[in-house]
Amino acid sequence: MFLSEAGARPRAGEISASERRKWVEVFKACDEDNKGYLSREDFKVAIVMLFGYKPSKIEADAVMSSANPDTSGVSLEGFLNVVQRKKEAQLYRNEIRHIFTAFDVHYRGFLTLEDFKRAFSQVAPKLPSRTVLEVFREADQDSDGHVSFRDFEYAMNHGKAK
């Protein structure tokens, strides 16, 4: 068993009608000339409006490289796909943060082996202590006896079954 098998998975699926309307409204607001697509700058503004941060050059390049070469921009359909993926990633990260916080009962910002033992005894009481120790050691990337949120997030995203 590894952390990524513990149940935290992106929740792919349907977006609500109100959320879709909001995204379409943002698209239209950023498509000032009614071109039917968002330029690189339009896209950046739309992401700021929806997520509160300016996308990096790498992120913008990745989106623009998948854009229609005839329009040199991102269509509504493409924009909705990008926004939905970003929203799912955001929800997944929040879920990981929630799990980490549930493990971190002392609010220290890191987890110890004792935190792992306590959490696993509640959710998987028959799991051998040796397995809990192995999971902890694998999550503790720098072997300092503490699993930071970054360590935990990495383990949740990249863990492998043994």
From Swiss-Prot:
So which domain of life are we looking at? Eukaryota
Q: Can you quote a single GO CC term?
A: cytoplasm
Matching entries from InterPro entries are given as: Centrin_CML-like, EF-hand-dom_pair, EF_Hand_1_Ca_BS, EF_hand_dom
Q: Which keywords belong to this entry?
A: Calcium, Metal-binding, Repeat
Pfam families documented for this protein: EF-hand_7, EF-hand_8
Where in the numbering of this chain does the EF-hand domain appear? Answer: 18-53, 91-126, 127-162
Q: Which SUPFAM superfamilies match?
A: EF-hand
Q: Give the binding site residues for Ca(2+).
A: D140, D142, D144, H146, D151
Single GO MF annotation: calcium ion binding
Q: Which GO terms describe its biological process?
A: microtubule cytoskeleton organization
- What protein name does the entry list? EF-hand calcium-binding domain-containing protein 11
What is the protein's species of origin?
Rattus norvegicus
